[in-house]
UniProtKB/Swiss-Prot annotation:
Gene (UniProt): pyrG
Designated name of the protein: CTP synthase
Regulation: Allosterically activated by GTP, when glutamine is the substrate; GTP has no effect on the reaction when ammonia is the substrate. The allosteric effector GTP functions by stabilizing the protein conformation that binds the tetrahedral intermediate(s) formed during glutamine hydrolysis. Inhibited by the product CTP, via allosteric rather than competitive inhibition.
Gene3D superfamilies for the chain: 3.40.50.880, P-loop containing nucleotide triphosphate hydrolases (3.40.50.300)
Reaction(s) catalysed by this chain's protein: UTP + L-glutamine + ATP + H2O = CTP + L-glutamate + ADP + phosphate + 2 H(+); L-glutamine + H2O = L-glutamate + NH4(+); UTP + NH4(+) + ATP = CTP + ADP + phosphate + 2 H(+)
Annotated pathway: Pyrimidine metabolism; CTP biosynthesis via de novo pathway; CTP from UDP: step 2/2
InterPro entries: Class_I_gatase-like, CTP_synthase, CTP_synthase_N, GATASE, GATase1_CTP_Synthase, P-loop_NTPase
Single Gene Ontology MF annotation: identical protein binding
Binding site for ATP: 14-19, 71, 240-242
Residues the record lists as binding L-glutamine: 54, 354, 382-385, 405, 462
Length: 535
C-alpha cells in the first residue's frame, strides 16, 4: 500500500520545507523506494504562471507543461525524477474543480461546502499523485505556515487521510524555527512549542519535528521539545544552515531521519547507499577553480527568480572542478557606455528568460558586447529572441527591428506570435508549454554539446522567430542549429564566427541535475573557462 508523508511549516515561512522534503525523498529513493512528491500552495491563483517573479520566484515547468512552484525544481534536482501536473496543487485549482463539478450537477443538488467537498477534492489530489506514478511513498509539502487561514482546508484534509487509511500509512513532519537571540545569548524553543500546539489543535500530531537553526541544538533542548511536543527525542531533527544545499540529505541521514520514517511506516528497506551523493558533496566543497558568469536580468533583486539557472551553472561547474560565481547585472542599468564596466570582468554572459519590455535594451547591449568581443554567450528564451534582434539591428542593419511583444508597430518583427496564439485572450496556461523535440544540425556548437540528432527540452513561450528573416540572417552568418522536427520553429541559434555564442528558445536549466549537468550549460561553462584561461 502507498504510504503518505506530509510536511508542514510553522513559526515563519521560507524555513526550507521544500529542501527537507526533497532531501527525505532522496534518502527514501536510495533505499529502493519509488518516491513521488508534490507541493500544495494555499493561494487562490490557479498556478504561478501569471504571477510576478517578485511575488513567487521562478515558475518551474514540468514535462507535461504544468507551470509550478520553484520547489518542484528542488524536488527534481534532489530526487532525480520528472514530476507532472499532479505535483503542484493550489487552492485556485481545487476550487475551480469543485465549482465545475457543481455546475455539472455532480453533487446532486447538495450544498457545496469546505467540508466535505473541498477537503475531499484535496484528498483526491493526494491519492491521485500516488496512483499516477505507482509510488511506494508520496511526500506532500503544505505551503504556508500553520495558523494561516488559507492553509486550514489542506490541514483538515491531511488530518482526515490518517483516519481514512490508518496511522501506519501516514506520517506528519513539522518544520519550525528555533531563533537565537544574540542579546540574551540563548536559543528559544517557545515559538516551536506554540506552533506544534497550534497544529495539534487542528487534530494533527507531528511524528517528527525538524528545527531550523543557526546554532547547534543541545540534547537538553531536544529533550525539552520532545516533552512539550509529545514526540520521541530522536524525532527532533536539527536542520542547521548548510554550506551547500546538497549536504542536507547527509545531515538528515546522520540523524536517522529516514530510518525513523521507515520504522513508523512499517517499511522494511535496507539503509540508503549515499556513496555517490557523498562524493558529490565532497566535490562541491573542494572545488579548486573559479569562473565568473554575468547574469543580465530584470529580476536580479530576487535571485529566486533565476534559481534553476544558477543551479544549472553550478552543476556544470562541478564537472570541471570549478566554482561558478554569478555576477548579478540589472539589465535596466546596462548602457553602451557602461557595459564594459559591468560585464568586462566576467568570463561568460548569460541572458535568461523573461516577459515584457523592461530591461530589454540593456540586455541587447550586453548581447552585442558578447558578440563583438567574442565572450561566450548563452541566451535562454527571451535571451534567444533578443540575440536574434541584436543581430538583425547591428549586423543586417534593420533599424527598429524588435519583437511584436515589445513593440507591436516594429517595422521588422524578428520575433512574432506563434500562429496558434494570434486569437488567444487568456494569459494563464496558454503558452507553448512542456517538453518538445528539437532537431539539431550537425557540425554546430549545439550538436557538439548534446552529441545527439534529436533532443527533448521544456518550453514556456508565446512568441517565436519570424521565418521570413531566416534567409537573410543565414547569409550574414547566423546559424539555425536547432529546429522543430518539421523545421518550422526555430529552437536554437548560434553564430558562425564566434567561439561560443548559443541561444535556445526553450529552458535548458529546468532539466539540469547536480550529477548530470544539462549539455548546453556544460558546454557554456567549458567555453567560459577556456575564455578565462586565454586572457
Amino acid at each position: 500500500m502507498t504510504k503518505y508523508i506530509f510536511v508542514t511549516g510553522g513559526v515563519v515561512s521560507s524555513l526550507g520545507k521544500g529542501i527537507t522534503a526533497a532531501s527525505l525523498g532522496r534518502l527514501l529513493k536510495n533505499r529502493g523506494l519509488n518516491v513521488t512528491i508534490q507541493k500544495f500552495d494555499p493561494y487562490i491563483n490557479v498556478d504561478p504562471g501569471t504571477m510576478s517573479p517578485y511575488q513567487h520566484g521562478e515558475v518551474f515547468v514540468t514535462d507535461d507543461g504544468a507551470e509550478t512552484d520553484l520547489d518542484l525544481g528542488h524536488y527534481e534536482r534532489f530526487i532525480d525524477i520528472n514530476l507532472n501536473k499532479y505535483s503542484n496543487v493550489t487552492t485556485g485549482k481545487i476550487y475551480s474543480s469543485v465549482l465545475q463539478k457543481e455546475r455539472r450537477g455532480e453533487y446532486l443538488g447538495g450544498t457545496v461546502q469546505v467540508i466535505p467537498h473541498i477537503t475531499n477534492e484535496i484528498k483526491e489530489r493526494v491519492y491521485r499523485s500516488g496512483r499516477e506514478t505507482n509510488a511506494d511513498v508520496v511526500i506532500t509539502e503544505i505551503g504556508g505556515t500553520v495558523g494561516d487561514i488559507e492553509s486550514l482546508p489542506f490541514l483538515e484534509a491531511i488530518r482526515q487521510i490518517k483516519s481514512d487509511i490508518g496511522r501506519d500509512n501516514v506520517m506528519y513532519i513539522h518544520c519550525t524555527l528555533i531563533p537565537y537571540l544574540k542579546a540574551a545569548g540563548e536559543m528559544k524553543t517557545k515559538p516551536t512549542q506554540h506552533s506544534v500546539k497550534e497544529l495539534r489543535s487542528l487534530g494533527i500530531q507531528p511524528n517528527i519535528i525538524v528545527v531550523r537553526t543557526e546554532m547547534p541544538v543541545s540534547q537538553d533542548m531536544k529533550d525539552k521539545l520532545a516533552l512539550f511536543c509529545d514526540i520521541d527525542t530522536k524525532a527532533v531533527i536539527e536542520a542547521r544552515d548548510a554550506d551547500t544545499l546538497y549536504a542536507v540529505p547527509l545531515s538528515l541521514q546522520e540523524q536517522n531521519m529516514d530510518q525513523i520514517v521507515c520504522d513508523h511506516l512499517k517499511l522494511d528497506n535496507p539503509a540508503a547507499d549515499m556513496t555517490e551523493w557523498t562524493a558529490l558533496v565532497e566535490k562541491v566543497r573542494n572545488l579548486s577553480k573559479k569562473t565568473k558568469i554575468a547574469l543580465v536580468g530584470k529580476y536580479v533583486e530576487l535571485q529566486d527568480a533565476y534559481i534553476s539557472v544558477v543551479e544549472a551553472l553550478r552543476h556544470a561547474g562541478y564537472s570541471f572542478d570549478t566554482d561558478v560565481e554569478v555576477k548579478w547585472v540589472n539589465a535596466e542599468h546596462v548602457t553602451a557606455e557602461n557595459v564594459q564596466e559591468l560585464v568586462g570582468d566576467t568570463d561568460g554572459i548569460l541572458v535568461p528568460g523573461g516577459f515584457g519590455d523592461r530591461g530589454v535594451e540593456g540586455k541587447i547591449v550586453a548581447i552585442q558586447y558578447a558578440r563583438e568581443n567574442k565572450v561566450p554567450f548563452l541566451g535562454i528564451c527571451l535571451g534567444m529572441q533578443l540575440a536574434s534582434i541584436e543581430f538583425a539591428r547591428n549586423v543586417l542593419g534593420l533599424e527598429g527591428a524588435n519583437s511584436s511583444e515589445i513593440n507591436p508597430d516594429t517595422p521588422y518583427a524578428i520575433i512574432d506570435l506563434l500562429p496558434e496564439q494570434k486569437d488567444v485572450e487568456d494569459l494563464g496556461g496558454t503558452l507553448r508549454l512542456g517538453l518538445y523535440p528539437c532537431k539539431l544540425a550537425e557540425e554546430t556548437n549545439a550538436y557538439n554539446a548534446y552529441n545527439e540528432p534529436v533532443v527533448y527540452e521544456r518550453h514556456r513561450h508565446r512568441y517565436e522567430f519570424n521565418n521570413q528573416f531566416r534567409p537573410d540572417m543565414e547569409k550574414a552568418g547566423f546559424v539555425f542549429s536547432g529546429t522543430s522536427p518539421d523545421g518550422r520553429l526555430v529552437e536554437i541559434i548560434e553564430l558562425k564566427d564566434h567561439p561560443w555564442f548559443v541561444a535556445a528558445q526553450f529552458h535548458p536549466e529546468l532539466v539540469s541535475r547536480p550529477n548530470r549537468p544539462q549539455p548546453l550549460f556544460h558546454d557554456f561553462v567549458r567555453a567560459s573557462i577556456t575564455n578565462k584561461e586565454s586572457k
